[in-house]
Amino acid sequence: MSVNRPRGTRDFLPADTARRRYVESVMRNVVLNWGYSEIITPTFEHLDLFTLKSGEGIIGELYNFTDKGGREMTLRPELTAPVMRFYVNELQPFPKPLKLFYFENCFRYERPQKGRFREFWQFGVELIGSGKSDSDAEVIALASALLKAVGIKGDMKLGNLAVIRTLLKGLEPEIVSNVMRLVDKKEYAGLEALLDEIGAEEQLKSDLFRLIHLQGRYILPEVKGIVGNIPELVSFEKTLKLLDAYGVDYSLDFGIARGLDYYTGMVFEVYAEGLGAQKQVCGGGSYQLIQLFGGGDVPSTGFGIGFDRIMEICPLVPPAQKSLVVVSKPDTHLEAVKVATELRNYLPVQIDLMERNFKAQLSYANTINADYVIIVGEKELEAGKLTLRDMVSGEQELLTLEEIIEKISGQ
């Protein structure tokens, strides 16, 4: 019977895995330098965790199941809700703000296509416990720094849902949610039809459509002309000044709504070329979600980066590392094992495990593109030395083990 990998999943070859791990390590180093700590949450959670946050409609996208105890479970489709659950369960006593990051796989049952898989990896950041402009600015600047560190130039767009909601404050919450959803999907005909259906005033319709079509770096005066100098806009303006101090390149787009009810203020998205229709590589904003899971009214700001999309366009490659193969004959094999064991304290080393003859061992070293071969022969051992062969130039020399370590480690 033939068993294939499930649709929408991938196997990664050693070279691909090494590259992914390298890019991941670069990103980890960036967030660690910004003072964030890594957390890990379970691969599966109670189904309620995600239906509470996103509604019953999300079930069609989930890998959910009933466990042997009759409990409704699901593989995680995203990581913000698990982090908020973790905070409510265990992290509330910690000093604020809590600065957390994660790198985990997620699962969604959706149609696989370019840049979209049923198992995918997400790199994310959550700053919990501060609703200040400085927090928003740091999170945005960190997202920018992460993308820059992995060689991706993205088009960052910022919006603010609190500003949009000031125009909608007289409407029912369900209507506001529908409006935001239509704004997010840029379904302007549907938005106009909805506003007509509820009998919205012409001034509201005019102001809303003007606001959500405003784009550019220097549009705040126009925004103020529509909504006034409201506190939400004053706070947002402070965030923008901080971003200028961070040196972040951005533009404003008040048509960004992120499509999720829990976002409350600043929102942002980053788009990169070379990904076709799935060109968004990062998205986030400020939100109030913890209360939904039994915690207090705690402000948070965060973002997620689609790691698989990043890998499609990331130019980084792992630094080349010298590789060695220790070859020997049957009567010197035990000494070869000792040599390999010592060398592994300094660099990657392989030794024959197949009982190949001497010539076949050299051929294997050539096949795997080893940089060096160390020959452990009787004559070498009698002289207290080893033969180091450069597999590129073909040159070889007789050296002590210490000299070999010094020579190769210094390259």
Swiss-Prot record:
Task: Tell me the SUPFAM superfamilies matching this sequence.
Answer: Class II aaRS ABD-related (SSF52954), Class II aaRS and biotin synthetases (SSF55681)
Q: Which InterPro entries match?
A: aa-tRNA-synth_II, aa-tRNA-synth_II/BPL/LPL, Anticodon-bd, Anticodon-bd_dom_sf, His-tRNA-ligase, HisRS-like_core, HisRS/HisZ, HisRS_anticodon
Keyword field: Aminoacyl-tRNA synthetase, ATP-binding, Cytoplasm, Ligase, Nucleotide-binding, Protein biosynthesis
One BP annotation, GO: histidyl-tRNA aminoacylation
- Which HAMAP family does the UniProt entry name for this protein? His_tRNA_synth (MF_00127), HisZ (MF_00125)
* PANTHER family for the chain: HISTIDINE--TRNA LIGASE, MITOCHONDRIAL-RELATED, HISTIDYL-TRNA SYNTHETASE
Name it.
Histidine--tRNA ligase
